[in-house]
């Protein structure tokens, strides 16, 4: 009974002092915004190779440009007037799978970029990589008093604008044990009532599905894994399948979920792991898929039920039954998606397996009656994500069904409704226009930066060391009256999220009565971050500012201290520090004397060959001294690429070593001093080290000014030359002739 609230949170940091270095980024344009243009796409998501069609609505200056970004990287800039006809145009994204992009409409002048509007694009061949889950729960035209098909069109257009790529159909079915109502001749009954006696029109269920498919969304039907109505025996449900409980007098009775007396029935529970019950539901699902074009099954449960028994009065392990039920449903329809609700985490270990598309948790507060740990704090959400991530072997993202304004829902409302209760069809709260706009901004942000937000597992998290002048800063988990940071490593970048808890002591994600005050916006914050990598670019983005557009920032890096000015922090601002992408050769073997090349000023960078992930250098190595390869993107961590063997020795007979990036800090050596050609191929995962011909080393003519670089010089004989003047010397594998 659910809808998505997504957070991804992690933990680790080692800081080693880098050599003294000062780095300033290039000048970046000032970014402002006048968000007067609404942008739309024709689909919620795209498979690689599909063309995106855009529509822009609003007053667009003739000088406007369209920019397509992957993170901060600009893929393409076009003049809007040249590409758009009637404010409509197309774009073919790169062919890479599972990528998010941000498309910006803007003007520029005098060093200022003015953002007019933005929209995200998701290119993913399977929705389960980056799920954005919505729901529908009303399938009635109320005796023709509403134009339901028009409502479907507008509702799905809004979900499309949010890039929702999967939609759950709540309480669409007839009976839980007979979801499809058929006439005597096997045809569909066009109208029926659900368990709460609401009318359901088959026409509208099918129209929702067709409209969603046109937008590239998945349509997922909801049902319990073990529910049946009263008198289900008339439909073939056997008493031997019943899930039993025992009262205080030792009497057994069938477990049930009680519902209001005005409803059609209570829900009577079956043993989910019973093979005959599973086969019964497989047959019912054949009727579902045979009559409706659903893409999968949202499986529900009811959380912890206490001690339960089967019809033979043997104890039943419900979580094991859930896992068995999932496997049976997948075996029967392997092409269909499966998602199962882990209510308050109950049964997570058995539910989170290879047969579900992603993890789905209905979360509550303390004392919710479903068992499990407290889950009403932001920190609890991270714990759930980390648990799901670990149990799924880092394969599955997490979707939350989180009822934020649960008690405020008693006050009523109308219009497009929020998910406030576990009974999805209830519509007590309407979304304000302000909230609708904010959701567009946040879903654009979630989609455009999905590779930075959800592109790596919780293993990538670390605790960042951050200070903000004049403010209290705490690393995750949240603490009262503080700016809270959460950090993770993504590729060659460190990503630090700034979360504004500075004017609240309430650290719960639940705002039961909708009374929590907004955070106080902070501007132009002086920030210092300790970083263990050499930063090449710094940029920020926020769903609260400039519709999520990238702002590149100037910064200074002195040693391991990175300083910059954060433009603003309202709720959430993401800071991305792009690290230098380089493979280095380090160790005692690359220095004739001293302590070995273990900092960036002394290490030898390998040159990246054109195309692929191949790095090469020719360098003088001292025999029987250790060297290793390290990734400049994570210099401070200082773990090398490693081979199958510790202290592996390259010689004339063995020149290859398998390459990985995990495990111990392996080092290598060569048997004799001399020049060596070194190649690291990160595609084939191989290291090649072989003797080089010194006279074949590339020659470069230079003047003495070339000596200002800090890398060491050597004579052709391999001796260290601290101050070369005239003659031929070797540096970084290149022969240099000084005149």
Label each PLM-derived region with a short phrase:
Residues 558-580, 676-686:
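C-terminal beta-strand-rich structural cap/linker in extracellular carbohydrate-active enzymes
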Residues 472-533, 570-573:
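Carbohydrate-binding surface patches
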Residues 580-623, 632-659:
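Aromatic-rich carbohydrate-binding modules that target alpha-glucans
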Residues 693-717:
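Residue-level detector of functionally pivotal "anchor" positions at catalytic/ligand-binding pockets or at interdomain
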Residues 126-131, 137-148, 221, 225-292:
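Active-site-adjacent "subsite" loops/lids of carbohydrate-active enzymes
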Residues 116-175:
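An acidic-aromatic substrate-binding cleft motif
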């Amino acid at each position: 009974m659910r809808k998505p609230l997504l957070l991804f949170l992690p933990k680790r940091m080692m800081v080693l002092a880098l050599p003294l270095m000062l780095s300033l980024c290039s000048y970046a344009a000032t970014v402002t915004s006048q968000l007067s243009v609404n942008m739309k796409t024709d689909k919620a998501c795209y498979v690689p190779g599909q063309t995106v069609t855009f529509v822009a609505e609003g007053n667009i200056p003739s000088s406007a440009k369209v920019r397509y970004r992957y993170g901060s990287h600009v893929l393409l800039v076009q003049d809007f007037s040249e590409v758009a006809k009637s404010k409509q145009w197309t774009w073919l994204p790169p062919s890479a799978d599972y990528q998010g992009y941000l498309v910006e409409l803007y003007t520029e002048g005098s060093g200022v970029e003015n953002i007019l509007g933005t929209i995200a694009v998701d290119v993913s061949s399977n929705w389960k990589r980056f799920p954005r889950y919505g729901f529908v729960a009303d399938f009635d035209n109320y005796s023709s008093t509403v134009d339901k098909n028009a409502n479907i069109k507008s509702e799905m257009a809004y979900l499309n604008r949010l890039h929702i790529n999967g939609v759950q159909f709540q309480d669409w079915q007839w009976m839980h044990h007979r979801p499809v109502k058929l006439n005597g001749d096997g045809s569909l009954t066009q109208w029926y009532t659900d368990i709460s006696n609401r009318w359901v029109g088959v026409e509208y269920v099918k129209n929702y599905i067709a409209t969603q498919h046109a937008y590239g969304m998945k349509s997922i039907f909801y049902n319990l894994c073990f529910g049946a109505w009263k008198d289900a025996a008339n439909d073939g449900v056997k008493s031997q399948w019943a899930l039993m409980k025992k009262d205080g007098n030792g009497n057994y009775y069938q477990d049930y979920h009680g519902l209001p007396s005005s409803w059609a029935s209570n829900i009577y529970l079956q043993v989910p792991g019973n093979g005959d019950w599973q086969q019964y539901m497989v047959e019912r699902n054949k009727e579902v898929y045979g009559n409706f074009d659903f893409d999968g099954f949202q499986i529900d449960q009811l959380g912890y039920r206490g001690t339960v028994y089967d019809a033979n009065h043997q104890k039943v392990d419900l979580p094991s039954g859930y896992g068995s039920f999932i496997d049976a449903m997948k075996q029967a329809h392997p092409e269909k998606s499966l998602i199962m609700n882990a209510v308050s985490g109950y049964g997570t270990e058995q539910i989170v397996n290879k047969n579900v598309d992603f993890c789905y948790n209905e979360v509550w507060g303390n004392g919710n009656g479903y068992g499990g740990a407290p889950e009403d704090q932001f920190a609890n959400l991270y714990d759930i994500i980390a648990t799901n991530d670990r149990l799924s072997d880092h394969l599955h993202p997490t979707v939350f069904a989180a009822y934020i304004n649960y008690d405020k829902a008693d006050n009523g409302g109308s219009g497009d409704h929020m998910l406030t209760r576990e009974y999805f069809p209830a519509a007590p709260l309407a979304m304000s226009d302000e909230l609708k706009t904010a959701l567009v901004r946040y879903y654009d942000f979630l989609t455009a930066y999905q590779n930075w937000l959800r592109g790596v597992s919780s293993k990538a998290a670390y605790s960042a060391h951050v200070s903000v002048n004049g403010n209290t800063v705490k690393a995750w988990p949240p603490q009262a009256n503080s700016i809270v940071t959460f950090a993770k490593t993504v590729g060659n970048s460190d990503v630090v999220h700034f979360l504004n808890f500075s004017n609240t002591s309430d650290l719960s994600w639940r705002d039961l009565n909708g009374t929590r005050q907004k955070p106080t916006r902070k501007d132009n914050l002086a920030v210092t971050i300790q970083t263990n990598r050499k930063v090449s670019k710094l940029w920020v983005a926020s769903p609260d500012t400039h519709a999520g557009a990238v702002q590149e920032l100037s910064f200074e890096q002195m040693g391991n201290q990175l300083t910059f000015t954060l433009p603003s922090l309202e709720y959430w601002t993401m800071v991305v520090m792009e690290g230098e992408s380089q493979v280095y050769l380090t160790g005692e073997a690359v220095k004739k004397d001293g302590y070995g090349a273990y900092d960036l000023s002394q290490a030898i960078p390998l040159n990246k060959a054109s195309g692929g992930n191949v790095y090469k250098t020719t360098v003088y190595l001292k025999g029987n001294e250790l060297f290793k390869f390290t990734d400049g993107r994570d210099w401070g961590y200082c773990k090398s690429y490693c081979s199958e063997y510790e202290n592996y020795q390259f010689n004339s007979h063995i020149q290859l070593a398998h390459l990985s990036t995990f495990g111990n800090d392996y080092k290598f050596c060569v048997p004799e001093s001399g020049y060596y050609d070194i190649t690291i191929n990160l595609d084939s995962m191989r290291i090649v080290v072989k003797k080089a011909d010194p006279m074949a080393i590339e020659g470069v003519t230079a003047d003495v000014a070339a000596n200002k670089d800090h890398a060491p010089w050597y004579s052709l004989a391999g001796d260290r030359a601290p101050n070369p003047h005239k003659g031929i010397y070797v540096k970084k594998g290149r022969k240099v002739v000084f005149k």
